[in-house]
């Protein structure tokens, strides 16, 4: 299997032992983007990056992760210009707001259809980091499906730990468009088998973890293999790493 700059991260993810290789890639991309925005390069000071963060903003999850990263000044500077645009736009929409009737007549807008409400929903649903993650993950999926042609990589997929439910859905849908029929005939049965086998494996680990708290097991030896069963079980279901500490800038 020939490796090059695009395939290395995907191969590394499948070799990582993570419950979902795409969660591994997503975490790597997310941390890299946080570091890009607030890290030593101070991208938040570049006009083009600031213009984009002013436009896109950050979702709740990534606003918290940016705060946790530890560069409070960088966060403050980004919020300064973001607030300028936010106030300008709010003022513009507020000036044109017309209070809808409680029971609007036919053809009249409801309050949910008011431009200011539509604008506010769009602002809350937009995130600079989410956009970059989506773009990067699309490229990783494309690389993954290109690698499927390689017998050595297929073996990694067959022997892997499956995927989280979130990325499982993405793979099932994307494979339909990315793979020819000959490869889909291998892909779908393989993914479904590895998903089922590994869900059973994780369920067994959770059972083992819970059993250690049974009073009948008092004084028994703890099994280190199931110590992290709860966090791995959560990753399988939701595609997250709940045991990860906050990602912080280097001291």
Label each PLM-derived region with a short phrase.
Residues 1-162, 166-251:
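Intrinsically disordered, low-complexity regulatory regions of eukaryotic proteins
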